């Protein structure tokens, strides 16, 4: 599991964001497109792509994309 791959898959969940705009230190909850529905989309993507079940708590406790990546990696 690689961080850059996770960032690309994370970015693909957004309609208006380009993967090149996303970096590991992006505070994703501050993005204009972020919503509770986006959180559900990320939870589903992580389950489908990585076979890991994350919870809303994991997203709430993560500030950056890399923080969330580290949570997913620790559960894998």
Where are the model-predicted features located?
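Phosphopantetheine-dependent thiolation modules in NRPS/PKS and related acyl-activating systems
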Residues: 1-34, 38-43, 48-76
């Amino acid at each position: 599991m690689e961080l850059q791959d996770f960032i690309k898959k994370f970015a693909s969940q957004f309609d208006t964001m380009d993967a090149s705009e996303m970096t590991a230190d992006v505070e994703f909850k501050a993005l204009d497109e972020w919503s509770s529905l986006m959180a559900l989309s990320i939870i589903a993507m992580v389950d489908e792509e990585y076979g890991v079940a994350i919870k809303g708590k994991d997203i709430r406790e993560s500030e950056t994309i890399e923080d969330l990546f580290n949570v997913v990696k620790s559960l894998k």
